[in-house]
Amino acid sequence: KNMTTGEIELVAEEIVILSKAATPVFPLDDYQDVNEDVRLKNRVLDLRRPEMNQRIVTRSKISSTIRNYLDDNDFHEIETPILTKATPEGARDFILPSRVQSGKFFALPQSPQLFKQLLMMGGLDKYYQIARCFRDEDLRADRQPEFTQIDIEASFIDQEYIMEIGENMIKELVHMFCGDSLDSFPVLNWHDSMRDYGCDKPDLRIPLKLVEISELVKDEEFKVFAEPAKDNNSRVVALKIPRGNSLSRGQIDEYTKFVSKLGAKGLAYIKVNNTDDIENGLQSPILKFLNKETINSLVAELDLNNDDLLFFGAGKASVV
């Protein structure tokens, strides 16, 4: 029933064994989960599974699409040497001894950095390579000792050009292999990213932003907020967590310890139970330090809803 021909029944009249074979360690269909360690130890069998086979075919097509796209944009694919000399980079080199020159060694490239600079100096203004790279370092979630990277280099261009090349390449790949058409990518400069998200590479799938509230609290008697709000080198921000009211006091204390290790002085909060009753519908140790006008302004400015949680940060702008 799992075959394209449907569920069929055969009646055998004669069976001839042409060769004996051991029973496969696991079935080759995609209908059963198999432990990854078992799959890797029996890689030949694993690659015969339709899912794995299709992934390899798809990867091949992706590489071909990238090459066609860059070729159409007048980039030249140029291979660079694998056996090279050690250069200062971010990890240790893999070393390969030379058979011809005793006591001498080759280093496997961590990236084609040196060679692409030579190509630019040699007059090849637009270069790319789907390059194998080698880094002798501990495994990480996004890094293996041996990996492939798309290396692109161009001379006499501006930032917008290389961003456009990369964006359009991703759009073409997504359209061809996922069937989706992507909108233009959002662009953030470093200062806006640090101001709104607190890091230089935010995950924009998470719709949480730091909101500046210095103007709202600068006249408060609560010095924890008022003093940094009046300091040009400091700031006061709020972070709204939709439906975050379920966080326990213990969990909030753990977050407070975490931000304290990063240099923050603390982590004030307000739990929103009922926005229709501001006087009794909010829960926080700091409410007694804030006047009603400020609290009402916070509710309106941050568009607070029932069961939301509001965190506050106050201090030097380099920390908050």
Locations of regions flagged by a protein language model:
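Class II aminoacyl-tRNA synthetase catalytic cores and aaRS-like
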Residues: K1-V320
